[in-house]
Amino acid sequence: MTTQLEQAWEIAKQRYAAVGVDVEEALRQLDRLPVSMHCWQGDDVAGFENPAGSLTGGIQATGNYPGKARNAEELRADLEQALSLIPGPKRLNLHAIYLESDAPVARNEIKPEHFKNWVTWAKANKLGLDFNPSCFSHPLSADGFTLSHANDEIRQFWIDHCKASRRVSAYFGEQLGTPSVMNIWVPDGMKDITVDRFAPRQRLLNALDEVISEKLDPAHHIDAVESKLFGIGAESYTVGSNEFYMGYATSRQTALCLDAGHFHPTEVISDKISAAMLYIPRLLLHVSRPVRWDSDHVVLLDDETQAIASEIIRHNLFDRVHIGLDFFDASINRIAAWVIGTRNMKKALLRALLEPTAQLRQLENDGDYTARLALLEEQKSLPWQAIWEMYCQRHDTPAGSQWLDNVRAYENAVLSQRG
């Protein structure tokens, strides 16, 4: 521990103690909050099923930065590099297209054995795993419909894929001793004016009921469903809207996934957390950064990221909210993207934990909105960075921008050698 860091830490502790905040307790609480990193940032959502295929489903990874992972070994190596630069507990979120098999495997026939290497790796790296069926980038999703498809055989294919995915998810939870959150998102929708909006939603409702009909141990597996406003090629109608999935999660008591980019640009998911928590048992968050649409830019330490973190902490939702990330930027170093976004999410959580919430809530209850605003603004100037640097030091990760040196060295030694 350097003298300079220690001095800054002691001064910061005193400053926070003066406003009633126990810094050590804040760091203990931060270690209770894993952030689930998404594997697909590492290869632009290509996966291993058909890496040369086109990305469909109304989503898009833009850019052509060199060095993306081309197989599971490279992706895991890149993830290890990123994980080493991020302090505190982490998880990894996998999509079904990241299976490993010597022979082609139909999506409705995926099995736990196709992900055993991921489980072995997760154990070695002390990570929990989360999962997602991949209802996109496939010939049977080419017309824009999956679980709500009007064709019975195609719809059943996707139902069976999601059922198989749930068993993989439960396998993760059983093997790793921490429940896997499996999120169902489908791109189903239409480009232009839609006459029958009801029938596809009825089919989606029935399909989801069939998907979750097999009872699985909640200690191993948690179901989540995710809405979206629109996607490329589905601008006019999305079957799985916010209202649809809010109703589904409430009536079926599944988890609800709120993605920061899946709403109108003037909406924020931070304001939806407390409302949803009144009706559903759990929330899954996909923290992202939409720029004018669901662009999935790298997460910043901006107002909305901070507001999301503050909602979790202020309402003590540690055990009911699962924090995941969802962005994919192919225009910058992909490892740096992981590190920047995940560290920013953790910084936001730390800043929320360092807030004198009880004092602020009392001012609010007393109607002293002047003092509430004044103290909210003054606390932004408190030396949270010194606390963050100590947290990084305790977890053997770089405290400041020194992590970029590690990324550059890895880029020169490893990424630059890839075709």
Swiss-Prot record:
Annotated localization: Cytoplasm
Documented EC number(s): 5.3.1.14
Full protein name: L-rhamnose isomerase
Domain of life: Bacteria
Quaternary context: Homotetramer.
Cofactor: Mn(2+)
Lineage of the organism: Bacteria, Pseudomonadati, Pseudomonadota, Gammaproteobacteria, Enterobacterales
Keywords on record: Cytoplasm, Isomerase, Manganese, Metal-binding, Rhamnose metabolism
Record-listed Mn(2+) binding positions: H262, D294, D296
Cofactor note: Binds 1 Mn(2+) ion per subunit.
One Gene Ontology cellular component annotation held by this UniProt entry: cytoplasm
Reaction equation(s) it catalyzes: L-rhamnopyranose = L-rhamnulose
Family, similarity comment: Belongs to the rhamnose isomerase family.
Protein task: Catalyzes the interconversion of L-rhamnose and L-rhamnulose.
